[in-house]
């Protein structure tokens, strides 16, 4: 059977106009089984023609289409005959470029709004209720639609909430289908993707695995690849995927800096080195890191010390190896998007990964750079990786070094390790380990008076942090049931030495960050 490539899959591309929800649009389309990618708004009609997508989506954005310097579009894209859906700014751009009118709205709409579908023959709203709740986020609105377009939905403040040109298959909606607050958002996107574009849901993770293995083998040949294992999800999945493709041509370096979670070193070595057979060079650098951190309390100094020391250790080990031609990284699609939707930009900015010396010339392999985080977890499961590795909590590069506020000592690290394990165990028992985006314990360095048994104590406070987020840019504290928090609290106080008080962090991001340091 012939090997599949990207030309074998239907695609819908999203042009990036700066919306905070851009990644969500792409993810929603992929969830339908259709491959989707985010491209710069400067992408030309000729470039799109080569990609041959089934559909094009113009995203939302913060600009006003009538301002000088506003993001625009190659007008030839409207003549390709490929269905187009404009969302928010995208709809305004379609109207503006085709003879309609867009003005600043006297009443801005941010948040939930009620719309009414006014055309029962609408392609976008086919099979959906007349009244719907949607999520608006706009300060401009269309005040006159182009010739050939019809209005298919309206709201009290926005008479042209959705428009269609069925002859040219060009559509616009003023609200955001991609966010959960839009009641029938997925259905509208499905009507566009399947009904209008005629796309097939033929994109699967198993196809991705087969294509990546073939691609890696072609790229690497008989040469060797170096991977820095952190114990996190991304590098672990990269390791297993590469090993399946090229076996022992992959050499991994795992630096134990003494700032990992309880049982993490053993789990990585037993699972990746044992079950999956990765060739792992384990470096015990605990004493080296702790000696450098002694007496240091400033969080930025701690980060720099940990980062620089990690680079140095990795460099020392890498220079001992001969015949390495490739460096593998766990770069995700989100990293590329945040670098300006440009793969070339990302490769350049990440090329000297970990501060590797300039004379160590590696070619870069980034097998996950078209995937989102949730897709990486799906990939890990398809590769047969254990639940504990695939669903491991996000973990900062400096590790527990920034979850111990102030000076890092072995005693303080033990408190964080033990309390964090209890939190993870109880969240797993309660089924919260997949529903809460990130959760961990932190040692603020606060000591307070308590009573345990018949005696007075003066011990540490442990903080619990649990948040929900989509992309980490903003986050809201999780509403954890009190009985679960109480159980965690009782266990930590009883099972972890030198702790007599537990607090729960109920601040969101912003104003706080997810991590305390």
Swiss-Prot record:
GO terms for cellular component: cytosol. The active site is at 88 (nucleophile), 176, 178. Pfam families: GATase, GMP_synt_C, NAD_synthase. It comes from Latilactobacillus sakei subsp. sakei (strain 23K). Residues 11-202 form the Glutamine amidotransferase type-1 domain. It comes from the Bacteria. Signal peptide: none annotated. This is GMP synthase [glutamine-hydrolyzing]. ATP binds at residues 230-236. Catalyzes the synthesis of GMP from XMP. Homodimer. Residues 203-392 form the GMPS ATP-PPase domain. Keywords: ATP-binding, Glutamine amidotransferase, GMP biosynthesis, Ligase, Nucleotide-binding, Purine biosynthesis. The gene is guaA. GO terms for molecular function: ATP binding; GMP synthase activity. PROSITE patterns: GATASE_TYPE_1, GMPS_ATP_PPASE. Its EC number is 6.3.5.2. Pathway: Purine metabolism; GMP biosynthesis; GMP from XMP (L-Gln route): step 1/1.
